[in-house]
Structure formats: C-alpha cells, structure tokens
C-alpha cells in the first residue's frame, strides 16, 4: 500500500450548473479533498482549501472552495501569472510517465494552464510545457465567485469558489 494520497474521481449522472453550489444537487454528496501540501517557496498563509471532482463522457469537472483572507487578484488574461494572486491548482496525469496537465486558476476565474511533458526547471521555466490556447480555453465552462479585481489586498476573511470543466 502506498503512502501517496489519492482521490478517486466519481462519474456523475448530471452535469454541474456552474453556479458555485458546493453543497448543491450535483456536488453535495461528492467526497472532498483538502489541500494539505504547499509549495516550499510559498508564504506561511495557509487558507482552508477544499476541492471536489467529477467526470462524465463530456468533461472532467472541478470545484474549489477556499476560506481565505489577504486576498489579492489582478490577473485577468489567459496564461498570465495567476500564481501571484489568490489561486488554486489542479494537476492530473492521464497516463503514468507521459506528462501531466496543470490547471491553475485565480479567484477571478483567470486560467493558467499547460501540458507539461518535461518538468525539469530551466532559467526560462519548464523543460517542455505547452500552454493552453485561447480557443481551447473557450471550450471550458467557468464559474468564479469573486466578481472583479481585488486590489489592494483585502485582509478580511472571505470564502471564494471557482468551478470549471475540462472537455
């Protein structure tokens, strides 16, 4: 038995409504995973971050709920540096050893996504990574609860949700 954390994505009989309904009809009974591992270079701020995922023949569906404070979000362009905003990341590896996909989204619903074939760090970034194109991103359904840019940083407690499909 492995000590590697695992989450089994269940098949859904109904497509989510993309309304952020964490406990709604589609998402309510879906098992939750909590984010417990953080990048070593990140700040000491550790908001309570939970996620759920489902799939059907059309797409993979992901929802995140974040209990946060010190929220800042300024990036609004596809593949911009959302890592500098309040954001979440979803990684998956369709076939072991054949690369992985990284979907990073800020609380405004701004996406930074790529297919990583070689994760080796170079001065320019990763060894080989192909960013999602605008026409591909347009095929995704996205919901975000934060309506617009958050600047300056908001130090008040807030809960934010992002929900999206990956066709």
Predicted feature locations:
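Structural preference for beta-rich elements and adjacent junctions enriched in aromatics
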Residues: 1-167
């Amino acid at each position: 038995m492995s000590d590697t954390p695992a989450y089994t994505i269940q098949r859904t009989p109904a497509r989510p409504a993309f309304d952020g309904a964490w406990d709604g009809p589609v998402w309510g009974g879906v098992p939750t995973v909590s984010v417990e591992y953080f990048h070593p270079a990140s700040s000491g701020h550790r908001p309570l971050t939970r996620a759920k995922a489902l799939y059907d023949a059309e797409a993979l569906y992901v929802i995140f709920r974040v209990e946060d404070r010190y929220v800042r979000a300024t990036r609004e362009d596809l593949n911009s540096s959302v890592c500098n905003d309040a954001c979440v990341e979803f990684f998956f590896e369709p076939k072991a050893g054949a690369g992985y996909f990284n979907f990073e989204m800020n609380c405004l619903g701004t996406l930074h996504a790529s297919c990583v074939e070689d994760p080796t760090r170079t001065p320019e970034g990763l060894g080989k990574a192909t960013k999602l194109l605008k026409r591909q991103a347009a095929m995704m359904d996205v919901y975000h609860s934060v309506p617009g840019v958050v600047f300056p940083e908001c130090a008040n407690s807030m809960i934010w949700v992002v929900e999206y499909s990956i066709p």
